[in-house]
Structures are given as structure tokens and as C-alpha cells.
Regions:
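Gly/Ala-rich beta-loop-alpha elbow adjacent to hydrolase catalytic centers
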Residues: 79-87
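Flexible "cap/lid" loop of the alpha/beta hydrolase fold
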Residues: 92, 98-130
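Conserved HGGG/HGGXW glycine-rich cap/lid loop of the alpha/beta-hydrolase fold
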Residues: 1-48
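Conserved serine/cysteine hydrolase catalytic core
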Residues: 173-215
Length: 250
């Protein structure tokens, strides 16, 4: 999207998400200033029969694409949730160069293989039906979600819209691989790359521990504090989100 000679902005979706549901509303707001590239993860692309491998294998594929099509240099990358882990990995590995890396209120959770397996095995049966069918399999969970959406206003509805509709082509194994691999793939501490700024949209309602986590993994992160919930700026305030991205990357 956008002019071929414009600065490149790479958009990376969140956990088990499709690029269009995450970024469809903001691409038109960005395409006047950037050449916008959206990552479609293996296993979550309706045009392919693939499964998500691991975070590092997917990172290598992204790097290879950027080397081939962008000369290995882009203006900025924005990672929504899980996508922020990819931004961190791209910065730390230094196989491509970006002027700005932006993390969208990513949690950057990490766990031991055993703990990650337990978390994955517990959450996957709950999450996968939502990916495949667009709704929870357990009726009581769907009722609670519907009630929460009615009571909480725009955020839950907007967040569910960002998560996307039913995607029967996504396998449980892809979701499992993505969730588990994200937890066990280490992100180095005090990442510092000359010529690369790291910006983080810090959603304060997620909790104070994330400030310390961001400062643990990045040497000089620029925190953009917002009294919001996880990815609420992107989900509910796309115009403001696009304005902030432009103010950082242009």
C-alpha cells in the first residue's frame, strides 16, 4: 500500500490475528506517507496452506523478504501485541536495519518450556474455537463475553473486531506453535542498536510491571504513556494512533 518510493512501514499483527483485522482501519491513514507492508504469518494466511513454525523461523523469513524487497533497510516497524516480540527480535538480531521500532503495548511474556507448555495446553482449547469459529465453544464463556461487550462499551467490541471473524483455515497447531514459541523465545536484555530508536505505546492500565519489563529488554526505550488498556489506542482511536506513528517515523 502507498507509493513505491515512500519510506517503508512494516506492520506486524498480534497473536493468532490476521493483518487485515488488525490494521485494515489504519492502512488508509498511513498510505499517504508510507509504503505500508503488512506481515501475514505462516498459518494465518488464507491464500496458503502453511503452519506457523517458530518465532525465529518466521523472523528469518521476514528478514529475507526485507533484504530482497527493501534492501534490508526500512523506516519503521510497528508490532501489535505479539508483533512487538518480532520488532524486538528484528532489532536485536541486526540482520536488517530500521530507523524506528514501535511496540504496541506488548506484554513480552517469557516462560520456561514446561511453564509455556502448561499455559499453552490450558489456553489453547479456549482460544482456538474463537479463531476457527469466531466464538467460544463453551456457551457460558460466550455469554460472559457478550455481557462484557455490552457493559464495557467500545473497547471489548473493538478488540474482538481486531481479533477477526471465523477463520476455519487456521489449524490448532499453528496457534499452538505461535503461542508456545513466543513464550520460550528469549528476547535479549538492554537491546541497543545505533541508529535505531525503540518506541513503546505503554498502556498504563496493563500494570506497572511492564515499565520495568520494557526497560529490562531495551537500553533506551521511549515510552509513550497512555491511560488505556492493551492495544486500545489502535483498536478504538485509529486516527490518534496513526498520528502518533507518523510523528515518530516521519
Amino acid at each position: 500500500f502507498g507509493a513505491e518510493d515512500a519510506p517503508v512501514l512494516l506492520l506486524l499483527p498480534g497473536t493468532c490475528c490476521h493483518w487485515k483485522s488488525n490494521f485494515g482501519a489504519v492502512i488508509p491513514l498511513l498510505a499517504d506517507s508510507f509504503r505500508v507492508l503488512c506481515v501475514s504469518y505462516d498459518g494465518f494466511d488464507e491464500t496458503e496452506q502453511t503452519e506457523f513454525p517458530t518465532m525465529l523461523e518466521e523472523t528469518e523469513k521476514i528478514e529475507a523478504y526485507l533484504k530482497t524487497h527493501c534492501g534490508g533497510h526500512i523506516r519503521a516497524a510497528y508490532g501489535c501485541s505479539l508483533g512487538g516480540s518480532f520488532v524486538g527480535l528484528l532489532a536485536a538480531r541486526q540482520n536488517i536495519h530500521m530507523n524506528c521500532g514501535i511496540l504496541g503495548s506488548s506484554d513480552l511474556d517469557q516462560a520456561s518450556p514446561l511453564a509455556a507448555r502448561l499455559q499453552t495446553d490450558f489456553l489453547l482449547p479456549l482460544i482456538y474455537p474463537v479463531v476457527r469459529d469466531g466464538k467460544f465453544k463453551a456457551k457460558f464463556l460466550q455469554k460472559r463475553l457478550d455481557k462484557s461487550a455490552r457493559e464495557s462499551g467500545d473497547y471489548v467490541k473493538a478488540f474482538l473486531k481486531m481479533f477477526g471473524k471465523a477463520r476455519p483455515y487456521v489449524t490448532m497447531q499453528s496457534c499452538k506453535n505461535q503461542f508456545y514459541s513466543d513464550l520460550i523465545t528469549p528476547l535479549p536484555d538492554k537491546i541497543h542498536v545505533p541508529g535505531t530508536e525503540i518506541h513503546i505505546f505503554y498502556a498504563l492500565k496493563m500494570g506497572a510491571k511492564y515499565r520495568a519489563r520494557y526497560q529490562q529488554h531495551f537500553a533506551h526505550p521511549v515510552l509513550h504513556e497512555q491511560n488505556l488498556q492493551h492495544e486500545e489506542l489502535l483498536a478504538c482511536h485509529p486516527v490518534q494512533w496513526a498520528h502518533l506513528v507518523k510523528s515518530i517515523a516521519l
